[in-house]
């Protein structure tokens, strides 16, 4: 089973890129994990936020495969502590036959089409983070979950 993080737009700041790639590589010691970047839209000034979400939603839909289990990172999703998230991941890793796909949307969130394709929504926090920063926070939590499940020394309760 493969786990994929889909994000809209490239990561710009080099220190985030370095840290994200480090956690992705660390996570690959435990599971098949990668990050897929949907190119950011060009000429968005003429689009309403709703139109931008629709166009991004079309690109996200093209990146999905039949059988994917889709989980949105969404401010209205379920919040979990790290150990809870690890147990949640464990269940998903056992029960998902194809890909477990996490999606971080664009600046205005997700289109209804993407919400309709989702199986679940999770939230990283009640706080708002930049789209650059949440990528790093999330890949670190995936790595942390894997170390919890495998008895590694990374997480301290």
UniProtKB/Swiss-Prot annotation:
EC number: 2.1.1.177
Enzyme class: transferase
GO MF, one annotated term: rRNA (pseudouridine-N3-)-methyltransferase activity
One cellular component (GO) term of this entry: cytoplasm
Subunit structure: Homodimer.
Highest classification ranks of the organism: Bacteria, Pseudomonadati, Bacteroidota, Bacteroidia, Bacteroidales
Catalytic activities: pseudouridine(1915) in 23S rRNA + S-adenosyl-L-methionine = N(3)-methylpseudouridine(1915) in 23S rRNA + S-adenosyl-L-homocysteine + H(+)
Family statement: Belongs to the RNA methyltransferase RlmH family.
UniProt name for this protein: Ribosomal RNA large subunit methyltransferase H
Sites where the protein binds S-adenosyl-L-methionine: 73, 105, 124-129
Origin species: Bacteroides fragilis (strain ATCC 25285 / DSM 2151 / CCUG 4856 / JCM 11019 / LMG 10263 / NCTC 9343 / Onslow / VPI 2553 / EN-2)
Function (record text): Specifically methylates the pseudouridine at position 1915 (m3Psi1915) in 23S rRNA.
Subcellular localization(s) per the UniProt record: Cytoplasm
Domain of life: Bacteria
UniProt xrefs under Pfam families: SPOUT_MTase
Keywords, comma-separated and alphabetical: Cytoplasm, Methyltransferase, rRNA processing, S-adenosyl-L-methionine, Transferase
Primary localization class, coarse: cytoplasm
């Amino acid at each position: 089973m493969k786990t994929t993080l889909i994000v809209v737009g490239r990561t710009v700041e080099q220190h985030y890129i370095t840290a994200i790639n480090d956690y992705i590589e660390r996570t690959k010691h435990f599971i098949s994990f990668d990050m897929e970047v949907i190119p950011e839209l060009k000429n968005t000034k003429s689009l309403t936020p709703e139109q931008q979400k629709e166009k991004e939603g079309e690109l996200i839909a093209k990146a999905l495969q039949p059988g994917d289990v889709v989980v949105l990172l969404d401010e209205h999703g379920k919040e979990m502590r790290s150990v809870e998230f690890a147990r949640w991941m464990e269940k998903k890793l056992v029960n998902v036959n194809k890909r477990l796909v996490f999606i971080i949307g664009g600046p205005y969130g997700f289109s209804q089409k993407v919400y309709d394709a989702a199986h679940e929504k999770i939230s990283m926090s009640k706080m708002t983070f930049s789209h650059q920063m949440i990528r790093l926070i999330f890949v670190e939590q995936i790595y942390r979950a894997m170390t919890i499940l495998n008895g590694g020394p990374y997480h301290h309760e």
